[in-house]
Amino acid sequence: VAAPAEYTDWARRFLSSPGGLDHKWIAVQAGASDVMKAWRPQHFGVTLARFSKQWDGGILFIGSSSEQDTIDEVIRAYREAGGRSAIKNAAGHTTLAQLVALLADCRLLLTNDTGPMHLAVGVQTPVIDLSVGHVDFQETGPYGPGHWVMQPDLECAPCGFEQVCSHHA
C-alpha cells in the first residue's frame, strides 16, 4: 500500500515541527470499536511517558473524533507520569489516504486491535498490538514479520464475546 505523493507531502507538512526540527514519530491508536478491546488510557499514558524518557521522537494520536475523550485521558496520564515528547493529534482530522500517509511516516504504531493496525502493516510500519479482552491475535493479526503482540498472561485470555472481563487488562 502506498499513499499518493500529494498525501505523502501533506503528512510531512503535518508532522513537521515549528522551528524546522523534525521528530521521529510513533503513532498511537488508543481507541477501539469495543471498550473491551481497548487497553486502559492510563496504561497508554504511563507507557508512553516511560518511552519518552528514552526517546526524543514525538507521539502522534490517530483515530476518530469520537475517541477524543480517550486521547485526552491518555495525554493526562502521560503528563502526570512525566512524559516529555512532542504531541500531535490527528484524530478526527484525516481522510483515509492522509492516515495511510501519516502511518507510512511513523516509526511505529502502538495500537489496540483496530483497522489502522492493518493499514500500518500495509505500509510496512512496525506495529505493537495490544491484544486485550476478547481479541485473539492469531485471528486478527497483525500479520507478517516485524510486528509484536502483547496479550495478558491470564488463563482466561482471550475472553469470550459475551463476558465482561474482570481483569480488563
Q: Model features per residue range: what roles?
A:
Residues 1-36, 75:
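Mid-sequence helix-capping/hinge segment at a functional interface
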Residues 30, 63, 91, 151-152:
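Pocket-edge structural micro-motifs
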Residues 40-133:
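Donor-binding and catalytic core of enzymes assembling or modifying cell-surface/extracellular glycoconjugates
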Residues 35, 68-69, 96, 136-137, ...:
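Flexible, glycine-rich phosphate/dinucleotide-binding loops
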Residues 5, 95-98, 155-158:
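A short acidic, often aromatic-flanked loop/helix-cap motif at beta-alpha or helix-coil junctions
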Residues 29, 118, 147:
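Histidine-centered active-site/metal-ligand motif
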Residues 75-76, 86-90, 121-169:
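Nucleotide-sugar donor-binding patch of glycosyltransferase catalytic domains
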